């Protein structure tokens, strides 16, 4: 172990020596750049662009370009990047993560690689965790870029598509991680190229990269549409039922946060809903409502997992940042169950139209880099998932903060008493204090205790985060007491007020350890910026969530030996700190394994999504007749239909093929069983294809010109692709839930998901081609519909096509439920084109 550690340290030192060598070269240009006039310095941007176009690489331009930005920052902002900031900038340009401590000027560091990469003209995205930081950084650092002749855009959620397009077309675009993801998804749902807003994804520089790529890695971005539902009463009834239960009626597994009915609970459910057997197949939907109601009432906690806004909306609380997640909803009906629990209006369920995780979103960039003060603990994940190294950058000045040993108390009450006493003592001498909490509930509790103690303070949590920057800016003033959840104003420096250094600087008090060491380090890092004095102290109790769930037997045995008889007894031990860190490592390992599994599942979706989106983009950007593509679909549809009946009795096969042709290809008089008898399968395929081509040409002749033909072809394909893709996403979600249960049968759920997901994808492609064929052949095309089709900006179908499709389903021959579908998919009729009829 010691050898591995020594090797890691040596590698880091070797990397720093390389960085320092390049940084010195950048510094060697300082005098030359300082001697240039403003106009000459600004003219360097055009010079770099020309040199890049002539073949110089960005790496060759780096020393000079970085030196230009340093000088520009000095003239425009009065700030001159230090050597360690240059080193951080080089790491960012290389597509890695420089770990830079709080207050070391990460925002200024980013200006150098952002400028250099913007020279290529392909766009640079600077990603932040909220719109306040995007706007602040774009305004402040944008002055430097604009002065140097580069365009800067801010992409905000409230902007129109035209404004977003303008922002993305700038050399440098500031945006939040979620908005970039949603714009990508929306771009892949439009019908016309001019409605897309993004350019191809080139270089992303992610601020607080650990928050975005690790903490939120499992969070999918979902674009969904409302599904009309009459199930609100079921949510309410299920909620009323679970509220009648006592603790013996359900079983909670604390580590996994799962819950289920006990035998007595099942008996009560059967009595309440008047059922003979709750788990009969026809009660599957009801059990889903009950499961969600149980989770909502006994697992999901108000002010910890969610808050209720003033206008009665349930807002999810991000467990890592403490912020509310605007616009996000718990999936699979859980959000509606919480709404029923809290007695607020139950919003409609929604159906997913498109989704992507941050992991796969950011892996699509040609180059990805990020900044944070705390990433070394997640080094393996950054390397394996994102191919990014973590390079710790030395501080410009030595760290002067004192990190005290953790203090452990027997109970929560005794711990909080000690916290309040410590705050009171420090506040009396004027030392500023930042009290960090894991949950909104805890911050409210400590706030009440400080009010009782007569100590004035500010509270920063998910309920009032709009005042975040102002509260954090004042947190370093003499006598300031600030209570903050994990959000703790990341991205905003706490600067010490006058006379505070003499009092020991800012004291950070942690009220419990987080599951992640990184979050604890972030809280500590609020103090001691740029060599300032400071202190940190964590208070723990045996009743803390982490200690209850993951505290080891060694801790318990150690505490038994200490014989904690008095409630206010405190333990201060280095061994305790090591045990807590060991528990945190176990949790981090579990969380990493979970994220890795999510990625394995999502990679199946990613591959399929990339195929669909690439084909979609090809259709949208096409300025050509899409006839060859549609004819190929018609040919494959005919081939599948004929092959599906190859092993049937010959007479039955011919009858089935004729039925398929009449319902999906040609008018009834165009084909008969008589003319197909005696022909081989290949001959039948060719005959049907030639008849279909005649109808195809006849259909297109109704359109007024080539432009109308191309527009009609585009809308036809996109309408069907989007409809089938949405259904496919839903089916994959259901498959994922189903294969999860197979792990109990010793099957690998991921392997099964990959195999079945691939087959479902192939089936979907076949269904798309069948529907394109049938709609092309059967659509009733009218002049006014053509004009309306050309005005469409979404994937909604022209009305005549949509209604004709419905009519075609109704016109299908009378096929028994369990017979093969005449479309040739190989599925039973009830599971294919007969599904709507039977639903």
UniProtKB/Swiss-Prot annotation:
UniProt enzyme class? translocase
Q: What is its EC number?
A: 7.4.2.8
Organism the protein comes from: Streptococcus pyogenes serotype M1
Question: Where, by residue number, does ATP bind?
Answer: 85, 103-107, 493
The UniProt entry lists membrane topology as: Peripheral membrane protein
Please give the GO cellular component terms listed in this UniProt entry: cell envelope Sec protein transport complex; cytosol; plasma membrane
Extract the HAMAP family matched here.
SecA (MF_01382)
Give the similarity note: Belongs to the SecA family.
* Residues reported to bind Zn(2+): 821, 823, 832-833
Quaternary structure, from the entry = Monomer and homodimer. Part of the essential Sec protein translocation apparatus which comprises SecA, SecYEG and auxiliary proteins SecDF. Other proteins may also be involved.
Q: What is this protein called?
A: Protein translocase subunit SecA
Q: Where is this region: Disordered?
A: 780-839
Annotated keywords: ATP-binding, Cell membrane, Cytoplasm, Membrane, Metal-binding, Nucleotide-binding, Protein transport, Translocase, Translocation, Transport, Zinc
Please spell out the taxonomic lineage of the organism that makes this protein: Bacteria, Bacillati, Bacillota, Bacilli, Lactobacillales
At the top level, the lineage of the source is: Bacteria
Biological role: Part of the Sec protein translocase complex. Interacts with the SecYEG preprotein conducting channel. Has a central role in coupling the hydrolysis of ATP to the transfer of proteins into and across the cell membrane, serving as an ATP-driven molecular motor driving the stepwise translocation of polypeptide chains across the membrane.
Q: Name one Pfam family in it.
A: SecA_SW
Q: What GO molecular-function term can you cite, just one?
A: ATP binding
The record's listing under NCBIfam families reads: PRK09200.1, secA
For the keyword Protein transport, the answer is: yes
């Amino acid at each position: 172990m010691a050898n591995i550690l020594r090797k890691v340290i040596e590698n880091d030192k070797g990397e720093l020596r390389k960085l320092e060598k390049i940084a010195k070269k950048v510094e060697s240009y300082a005098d030359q750049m300082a001697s240039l006039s403003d106009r000459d310095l600004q003219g360097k941007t055009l010079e770099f662009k020309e040199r890049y176009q002539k073949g110089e690489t960005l790496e060759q331009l780096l020393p000079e370009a970085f030196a230009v930005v340093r000088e520009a920052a000095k003239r425009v902002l009065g700030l001159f990047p230090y050597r360690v900031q240059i080193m951080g900038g080089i790491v960012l340009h290389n597509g890695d993560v420089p770990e830079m401590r709080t207050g070391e000027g990460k925002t200024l560091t980013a200006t150098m690689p952002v400028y250099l990469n913007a020279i290529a003209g392909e766009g640079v995205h600077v990603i932040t965790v909220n719109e306040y930081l995007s706007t602040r950084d774009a305004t402040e650092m944008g002055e430097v870029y604009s002065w140097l002749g580069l365009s800067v855009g801010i992409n905000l959620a409230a902007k129109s598509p035209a404004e977003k397009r303008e922002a993305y077309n700038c050399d440098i675009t500031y945006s939040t991680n979620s908005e970039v993801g949603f714009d990508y998804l929306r771009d892949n749902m439009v019908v016309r190229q001019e409605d897309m807003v993004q350019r191809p994804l080139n270089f992303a520089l992610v601020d607080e990269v650990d928050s975005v790529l690790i903490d939120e890695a499992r969070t999918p971005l979902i674009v969904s549409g409302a599904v009309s539902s009459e199930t609100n009463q079921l949510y309410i009834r299920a909620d009323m039922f679970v509220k009648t239960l006592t603790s013996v009626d359900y079983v909670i597994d604390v580590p996994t946060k799962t819950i289920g009915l006990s035998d007595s609970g099942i008996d009560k459910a059967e009595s309440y809903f008047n059922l003979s057997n709750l788990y009969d197949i026809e009660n599957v939907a009801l059990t889903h409502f009950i499961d969600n109601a149980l989770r909502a009432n006994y697992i999901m906690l108000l002010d910890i997992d969610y808050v209720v806004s003033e206008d009665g909306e349930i807002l999810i609380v991000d467990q890592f940042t403490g912020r509310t997640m605007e616009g996000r909803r718990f999936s699979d009906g859980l959000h509606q169950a919480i709404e029923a629990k809290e007695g607020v209006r139950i919003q409609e369920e929604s159906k997913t139209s498109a989704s992507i995780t941050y992991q796969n979103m950011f892996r699509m960039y040609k180059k990805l880099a990020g900044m944070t003060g705390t990433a070394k603990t997640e080094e393996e994940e950054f390397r394996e998932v994102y191919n990014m190294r973590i390079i710790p950058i030395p501080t410009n000045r030595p760290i002067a903060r004192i990190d005290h040993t953790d203090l452990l108390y027997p109970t929560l009450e005794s711990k909080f008493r000690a916290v309040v006493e410590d705050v009171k003592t420090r506040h009396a001498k004027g030392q500023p204090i930042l009290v960090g909490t894991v949950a909104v509930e805890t911050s409210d509790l400590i706030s009440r205790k400080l009010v009782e103690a007569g100590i004035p303070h500010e509270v920063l949590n998910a309920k009032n985060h709009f005042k975040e920057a102002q509260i954090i800016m004042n947190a370093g003033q003499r006598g300031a007491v600030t209570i903050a959840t994990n959000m703790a104003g990341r991205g905003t420096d706490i600067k010490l007020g006058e006379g505070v250094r003499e009092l020991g600087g800012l004291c950070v008090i942690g009220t419990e350890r987080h599951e992640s060491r990184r979050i604890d380090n972030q809280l500590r890092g609020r103090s001691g910026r740029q060599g300032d004095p400071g202190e940190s102290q964590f208070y723990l109790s045996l009743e803390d969530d982490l200690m209850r769930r993951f505290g080891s037997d060694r801790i318990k045995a150690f505490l038994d030996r200490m014989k904690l008889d008095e409630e206010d007894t405190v333990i201060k031990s280095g061994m305790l700190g090591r045990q807590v860190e060991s528990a945190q490592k176990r949790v981090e390992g579990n969380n990493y394994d979970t994220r890795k599994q999510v990625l394995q599942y999502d990679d199946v979706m990613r591959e399929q999504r990339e195929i669909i989106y690439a084909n979609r983009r090809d259709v949208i950007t096409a300025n050509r007749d899409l006839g060859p593509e549609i004819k190929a679909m018609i040919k494959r549809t005919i081939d599948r239909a004929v092959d599906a009946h190859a092993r049937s009795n010959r007479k039955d096969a011919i009858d089935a093929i004729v039925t398929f042709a009449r319902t999906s290809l040609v008018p009834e008089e165009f084909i008969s069983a008589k003319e197909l008898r005696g022909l081989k399968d290949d001959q039948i395929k060719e005959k049907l294809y030639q008849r279909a081509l005649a109808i195809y040409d006849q259909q297109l002749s109704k359109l007024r010109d080539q432009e109308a033909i191309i527009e009609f072809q585009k809308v036809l394909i996109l309408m069907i692709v989007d409809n089938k893709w949405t259904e496919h996403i839903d089916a994959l979600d259901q498959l994922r839930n189903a294969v999860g249960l197979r792990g109990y049968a010793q099957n690998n759920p991921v392997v099964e998901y990959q195999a079945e997901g691939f087959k479902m994808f192939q089936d979907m492609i076949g269904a798309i081609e069948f529907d394109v064929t049938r709609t092309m052949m059967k659509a009733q095309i009218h002049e006014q519909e053509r004009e309306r089709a050309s005005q469409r900006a979404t994937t909604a179908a022209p009305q005549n096509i949509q209604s004709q499709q419905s009519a075609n389903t109704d016109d299908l021959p009378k096929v028994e439920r369990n017979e093969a579908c005449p479309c040739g998919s190989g599925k039973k009729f009830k599971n294919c084109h007969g599904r709507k009829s039977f639903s």
